[in-house]
Amino acid sequence: MTEALQWARYHWRRLIRGATRDDDSGPYNYSSLLACGRKSSQTPKLSGRHRIVVPHIQPFKDEYEKFSGAYVNNRIRTTKYTLLNFVPRNLFEQFHRAANLYFLFLVVLNWVPLVEAFQKEITMLPLVVVLTIIAIKDGLEDYRKYKIDKQINNLITKVYSRKEKKYIDRCWKDVTVGDFIRLSCNEVIPADMVLLFSTDPDGICHIETSGLDGESNLKQRQVVRGYAEQDSEVDPEKFSSRIECESPNNDLSRFRGFLEHSNKERVGLSKENLLLRGCTIRNTEAVVGIVVYAGHETKAMLNNSGPRYKRSKLERRANTDVLWCVMLLVIMCLTGAVGHGIWLSRYEKMHFFNVPEPDGHIISPLLAGFYMFWTMIILLQVLIPISLYVSIEIVKLGQIYFIQSDVDFYNEKMDSIVQCRALNIAEDLGQIQYLFSDKTGTLTENKMVFRRCSVAGFDYCHEENARRLESYQEAVSEDEDFIDTVSGSLSNMAKPRAPSCRTVHNGPLGNKPSNHLAGSSFTLGSGEGASEVPHSRQAAFSSPIETDVVPDTRLLDKFSQITPRLFMPLDETIQNPPMETLYIIDFFIALAICNTVVVSAPNQPRQKIRHPSLGGLPIKSLEEIKSLFQRWSVRRSSSPSLNSGKEPSSGVPNAFVSRLPLFSRMKPASPVEEEVSQVCESPQCSSSSACCTETEKQHGDAGLLNGKAESLPGQPLACNLCYEAESPDEAALVYAARAYQCTLRSRTPEQVMVDFAALGPLTFQLLHILPFDSVRKRMSVVVRHPLSNQVVVYTKGADSVIMELLSVASPDGASLEKQQMIVREKTQKHLDDYAKQGLRTLCIAKKVMSDTEYAEWLRNHFLAETSIDNREELLLESAMRLENKLTLLGATGIEDRLQEGVPESIEALHKAGIKIWMLTGDKQETAVNIAYACKLLEPDDKLFILNTQSKDACGMLMSTILKELQKKTQALPEQVSLSEDLLQPPVPRDSGLRAGLIITGKTLEFALQESLQKQFLELTSWCQAVVCCRATPLQKSEVVKLVRSHLQVMTLAIGDGANDVSMIQVADIGIGVSGQEGMQAVMASDFAVSQFKHLSKLLLVHGHWCYTRLSNMILYFFYKNVAYVNLLFWYQFFCGFSGTSMTDYWVLIFFNLLFTSAPPVIYGVLEKDVSAETLMQLPELYRSGQKSEAYLPHTFWITLLDAFYQSLVCFFVPYFTYQGSDTDIFAFGNPLNTAALFIVLLHLVIESKSLTWIHLLVIIGSILSYFLFAIVFGAMCVTCNPPSNPYWIMQEHMLDPVFYLVCILTTSIALLPRFVYRVLQGSLFPSPILRAKHFDRLTPEERTKALKKWRGAGKMNQVTSKYANQSAGKSGRRPMPGPSAVFAMKSASSCAIEQGNLSLCETALDQGYSETKAFEMAGPSKGKES
């Protein structure tokens, strides 16, 4: 009873809190917060509800009871039922379904004597059976949950007891908010708790979150600032602080609050300090934390909402037709009621036909008709298929089973199959019309290879590295005898290169099987326990093709000039080193430290490498270098005090600096490089780790300096280090820096150590890590430089963002400003070249801050960090105040190769009639190049580019493009405008006109505005493919939502990262790709695959099968019920519409419930109208599902008409056969039931395209079960069901030849029209499905010839249509050559304007010129004929 009260109290509080949780009392007063100061006792105004956590110890006993005593304990209960409430609650839930309520109404109605049609108990049978089956299923499910809950609640953990003053064993269910918990390695965390102590020297705790979000890579959590420096374990009795944090919520990536000490000093808390329930402690000996959320208020439980429920398009169509069946039922019942009233009115005075009531009262015909209406409702209730929905669920489970059992979906490398997370929308896979795809990790492998870089305005091609990649690829191809016909490399798809670089690619970097990308195995542990295991997904970034980087010879020469002498005093004068040298040093330092890479030992990948501090190292000549770095920084800084050449006095006390706040120090979100191709929202990304390989050891000895690079005493060499990165981009940059002996040696929460060639080990004090977010699109690290002792900000991000944050340089300014402007212009040119080669680009920049500037920023940043409400906004504002007036150092180009089979899959999906949109965070040139490489765009496509700076210009440019497209197809009668029909594309599929649209993120923002949405959708409907570049996660979801809601089409979104989650959830079907980017996309998806190529078979084969199977099965159910119910309806015309049945009630009930239920289920699971091989070879067949050809509205009515015809035959053939005989009512009904059974079963045989022995076995079993039941029932039931008496009827009929003749004749006549129609359809006017079905019966040679003929006819139709389209044009323009895959952007056109004048046209539109004037300014190209 206590548990029930607590459960009710919990839900009541949740209900009350839900109404007030989001109520804000007003905007956050940031200026008042600034005035509070660091140790001010003034509490900022907090909006909404917050939680105060007081430690569960003796000194806080009264306060604990006041605050924490009201919170729920850690007991969980996921069950819905108890022994007392199971029956009423389960029935209550089941009667939420309209169908169950309908049949319950019929049961109640049958208990009314005036309208009773059946024996009362019989009417209840179907409903009772359905309710019982579902109740048993729910009960078993709930009992399983109960056992799991009991097991979890009784787990043991160490909890501090305030009475015994020590840690004691307690069950999880007894843990409360405020308890101190001590956990050891490999223990599961029992509740959400703030980390106060870790045995790790750096205050780090490693956790595995696979039980929470599916990710198996380890994550790091940080001890609360101020407790990490303690040498001993935290003593709960000495803990005198309290915690104030936000109310419980389900956001795994957010935790806001602060810890307030007894002296009112506050320390900000973030998700980096929170250990979540369900995670496991790894590689940490022991941790101590205080519980802040327990039980059902933990984030894990709040996220445990189960799979999302989606209703498929086919199910919505079936629900509509059920309503039509209800209308048909009402019409039939009204007919029976009117007929009964008319019949009684004719015999009103003849008591033989109109039997009076027991009191002698005669019921009027009108009232009798009213009663008969309800009697007919009961009699004809089978018209509404109660078993339809149960059968649909069974069929869907069978379909899902076969999808997951398909061996073609198995990924040997990842040991994964396709996951079907949504069980009720498999049929929607066969009706997809629009596909929205992410790029990185979805279309590409997300395995990054460092290819090129630009430093200080000089481009370094790394030609030797390119040759190495080629040789590596060729070696793999030779070993595997694998000939790749499609290029997997994006860099070789581009023709233009920098002037100083020569083309080194003689052939494509072909794709290779993914299981050869992992490299060799490595050894975990040592000694006897060591075992050799293959690389898993956590260590995927381990192939030599990814880890090895061959240095560029020109850059290598410049590195060799970097020596300590360059910075040492010479003849009492300081020689300024070349500015390019300083750029190179900072560039590679930024590559090495501007990340969150964790350095590990290869034999123990999870153990970090730590080095002694810089102060204890015998490093020579560094003191002399400091002054020069300071002077260089002075020249570059924009601070007035630094411009004067004076070193500012530190305004930050040592104690203040030592307590630097952690801004997501150890595990920020996926770094900025993710934005380069996709803007990432979530901080959780998959791990990529790798160790040095033999190839790198060979290149590692290349002399960057005149002397040898020495490692620290007792520390491993650079090639013995293992890097664990959150994304492959980070690891690629760190390995690139290591190739130039700028080696990341170690990383702790307080410092980063880099071994920089001749300069020796450099230890940077790590002040802050500002993680990546989708708004800033960059990440930064704030460090104190060991040489200059200045605060330096290193930033990396997308060029579109970094270029806007650079310090403004005037052409008339100082020489340094001019040089920076030149560097910026050259770097931008290099970035464009990289993007045209399909490389992912990043900009690297830095900023030097004075201590005064840093102290001011730090003060404001601390206040933002310790706020609870609006923390994200305040931290964003703080980061943007820091990341400005940057100095550009250079840029990088990283190659991300296409996945195996992507071009073929996209080509097949295009042929299937699916319009594909690529939504990416990449820049325009990169996105277009990759679109050509994966065959999303074809070389002869007409390419239109939307890249404007204003809304008006966007609208005018779209209008111009639409006019150009309309000119091309003005003679085509099939053209349809958007206002007429949004569902059909304006351009016929075989018109020969192929167009592609490229739109940037800024322009997309304009296009998504309500005033331009219709115009934008009309433009995209003309295009076969659309590429949205520089798109944010929010824009991705808005695009999907716009297309889905306005065009009323079936959409599918596929992605692999956290930035794709919103898009995946908005689409009709969301598919997650399990790869390098974690499991967020998979957890949010309806289906999960391991590679994009699996999508083609999932849609073209299984999607087609699921849709056609379920469509035909649903239609068959409607047909079967209408055909059988009409037998009862026709009989009413011969019994005075009295509501009498000519068959026994038991047979009537079991006809649908037992005799004819199994065959359609087997049909729905096993039917194959076309083989998988043919469906893959002929993707065009998929269009039948897009058009819903298997289940159209007229198909439903034709099916019902056929059912009416068959019921007429089934009734009147036996009627005329036995007319004039002395056959009684039940003897007449027996041949009707038997013939009806044969008709409905053989009807299914006619409709089946692939009969197997299972089909035949089930059909024969259904027939035998009917005869067996009829014989046994007729022999045993004499008067068990009055007034019917089926005694010995079947036995008599089975001895009568007329019975067999009637059954055969009735079945033949009833099925003859459908059989003749199917025969004529297959021979005279076969559909594409039937023509393709013929291929399955051909020999391999005949099949090959037939496929060539099919494809040849299709190409001939396209060519004919294309030439007709060209001849129909009035402009007579000469066709422009389509952009090639070699140089995608060269001949891309917009509004038929040459690429060279495109930007001028857009600029004119942006400046407000009219459309005509803009194109006049664009040059003479407007008049060219294309």
Curated annotation (Swiss-Prot):
Pfam families: Cation_ATPase (PF13246), PhoLip_ATPase_C (PF16212), PhoLip_ATPase_N (PF16209). Its cofactor is Mg(2+). InterPro entries: ATPase_P-typ_cyto_dom_N (IPR023299), ATPase_P-typ_P_site (IPR018303), ATPase_P-typ_TM_dom_sf (IPR023298), ATPase_P-typ_transduc_dom_A_sf (IPR008250), HAD-like_sf (IPR036412), HAD_sf (IPR023214), P-type_ATPase_IV (IPR006539), P-type_ATPase_N (IPR032631). Mg(2+) binds at residues 438, 440, 1056, 1060. SUPFAM superfamilies: Calcium ATPase, transduction domain A, Calcium ATPase, transmembrane domain M, HAD-like, Metal cation-transporting ATPase, ATP-binding domain N. Its main location: membrane. The keyword Glycoprotein does not apply. The chain crosses the membrane at residues 98-118, 122-142, 322-342, 366-386, 1114-1134, 1146-1166, 1196-1216, 1225-1245, 1253-1273, 1293-1313. GO terms for cellular component: endoplasmic reticulum; endoplasmic reticulum membrane; membrane; nucleoplasm; phospholipid-translocating ATPase complex; plasma membrane. GO terms for molecular function: ATP binding; ATP hydrolysis activity; ATPase-coupled intramembrane lipid transporter activity; glycosylceramide flippase activity; magnesium ion binding. GO terms for biological process: monoatomic cation transport; monoatomic ion transmembrane transport; phospholipid translocation. Residues 506-531 are annotated as: Disordered. Residues 512-524 have a biased composition (Polar residues). It is an enzyme of class 7 (translocase). Keywords: ATP-binding, Cell membrane, Endoplasmic reticulum, Lipid transport, Magnesium, Membrane, Metal-binding, Nucleotide-binding, Translocase, Transmembrane, Transmembrane helix, Transport. NCBIfam families: ATPase-Plipid, ATPase_P-type. Belongs to the cation transport ATPase (P-type) (TC 3.A.3) family. Type IV subfamily. Catalytic component of a P4-ATPase flippase complex, which catalyzes the hydrolysis of ATP coupled to the transport of glucosylceramide (GlcCer) from the outer to the inner leaflet of the plasma membrane. Component of a P4-ATPase flippase complex which consists of a catalytic alpha subunit ATP10A and an accessory beta subunit TMEM30A. This is Phospholipid-transporting ATPase VD. The gene is ATP10D.
